[in-house]
């Protein structure tokens, strides 16, 4: 009789890939409403990186990320998610709390999920529910409230007294307080003003750099993808269409047209420069300052002959 494989501890998961092998997912199978959302997905999401998942509406982005922490079970194929193996049509996932603790999922508009009477209790809820002691959860509430940019005197306030952006920070602090190695963000800047968007993007970068936390970002905002992503997974009609760096994705105008995706604003300028004879599509440019520097360098070279 074979021994049951022990599931890994979170602290041992810092360098573990998330792997999809031949994964498909069908909603409402064998009913008139049957719909195939994912088809034959084979992809690896590396640890310690920021990976963006892009695609037009209905391409399967949200379905894909819900397989990562076991909210959905694949119809076919296998998901190795942080060392937890989830197979097609599996009835239950062993040690599901351990999996959920290792992978935090922040849904779109997470502020609507706040419900406790104080911010401290809201941040503590997830860790305590997943087995953490109240003492440790209370200390982590302080730590992660400060990390998301809110002062400690907010702990005793009601979350319902906060602005929309502040509520979102509290919701993210609650996910971070579970201290997993992976943070999944589904349209995390939706509904925010430009300043609020930029604040959150910088926060995600800081979390990635300071904690070596894997971040998986689902977004329609290609400016954000260009700004922070190490790798991009592009989906089309439930299939992986292309995997590459943001530069490999955005330099290909035909690819973006097939995906029905608008390029980042900087790449609109890069395409215009290309039409005028200055091809910068093979240069890794993330910011307008980097673009300006390359244009100046080109002019200097041209002047010198």
From Swiss-Prot:
A cellular-component GO term for this protein: ATP-binding cassette (ABC) transporter complex
EC number annotated for this UniProt entry: 7.-.-.-
InterPro entries for this protein: AAA+_ATPase, ABC_transporter-like_ATP-bd, ABC_transporter-like_CS, ABC_transpr_CbiO/EcfA_su, ECF_ABC_transporter_ATP-bd, EcfA2, P-loop_NTPase
Membrane topology: Peripheral membrane protein
Record carries keyword Translocase: yes
GO molecular function: ATP binding; ATP hydrolysis activity; ATPase-coupled transmembrane transporter activity
Main location: membrane
Pfam families in alphabetical order: ABC_tran
EC class: translocase
Binding site residues for ATP: 55-62
Record's keyword terms, sorted: ATP-binding, Cell membrane, Membrane, Nucleotide-binding, Translocase, Transport
Compartments where located: Cell membrane
Domain ABC transporter: 13-262
Reported function: ATP-binding (A) component of a common energy-coupling factor (ECF) ABC-transporter complex. Unlike classic ABC transporters this ECF transporter provides the energy necessary to transport a number of different substrates.
Sequence similarity: Belongs to the ABC transporter superfamily. Energy-coupling factor EcfA family.
Subunit (UniProt): Forms a stable energy-coupling factor (ECF) transporter complex composed of 2 membrane-embedded substrate-binding proteins (S component), 2 ATP-binding proteins (A component) and 2 transmembrane proteins (T component).
Protein name, as recorded: Energy-coupling factor transporter ATP-binding protein EcfA2
Source organism of the structure: Spiroplasma kunkelii
């Amino acid at each position: 009789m074979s021994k049951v494989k022990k599931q890994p501890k979170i602290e041992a998961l810092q360098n573990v890939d998330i792997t999809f092998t031949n994964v498909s997912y069908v909603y409402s199978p064998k009913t008139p409403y049957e719909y195939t959302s994912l088809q034959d997905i084979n992809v690896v999401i590396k640890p310690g990186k920021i990976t963006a998942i892009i695609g037009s509406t209905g391409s399967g982005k949200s379905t894909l990320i819900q397989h990562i922490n076991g909210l959905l079970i694949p119809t076919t194929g296998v998901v190795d998610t942080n060392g937890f193996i989830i197979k097609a049509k599996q009835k239950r996932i062993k040690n599901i709390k351990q999996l959920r603790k290792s992978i935090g999922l922040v849904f779109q508009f997470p502020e609507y999920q706040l419900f406790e009477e104080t911010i401290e209790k809201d941040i503590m809820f997830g860790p305590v529910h997943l087995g953490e002691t109240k003492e440790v959860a209370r200390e982590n509430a302080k730590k992660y409230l400060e990390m998301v940019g809110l002062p400690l005197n907010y702990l005793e306030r009601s979350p319902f007294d906060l602005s929309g952006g502040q509520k979102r920070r509290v919701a993210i602090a609650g996910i971070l307080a579970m201290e997993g190695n992976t943070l999944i963000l589904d349209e995390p800047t939706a509904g925010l003003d430009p300043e609020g968007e930029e604040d959150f993007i910088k926060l995600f970068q800081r979390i990635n750099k300071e904690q070596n936390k894997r971040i998986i970002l689902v977004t329609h905002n290609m400016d954000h993808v260009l700004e922070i992503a190490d790798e991009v997974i592009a989906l089309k009609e439930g299939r992986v269409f292309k995997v590459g760096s943001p530069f490999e994705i955005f330099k290909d105008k035909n690819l973006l047209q097939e995906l029905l995706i608008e390029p980042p604003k900087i790449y609109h300028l890069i395409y215009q420069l290309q039409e005028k004879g200055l091809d910068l599509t093979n240069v890794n440019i993330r910011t307008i300052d980097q673009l300006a520097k390359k244009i100046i360098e080109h002019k200097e070279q041209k002047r010198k002959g």
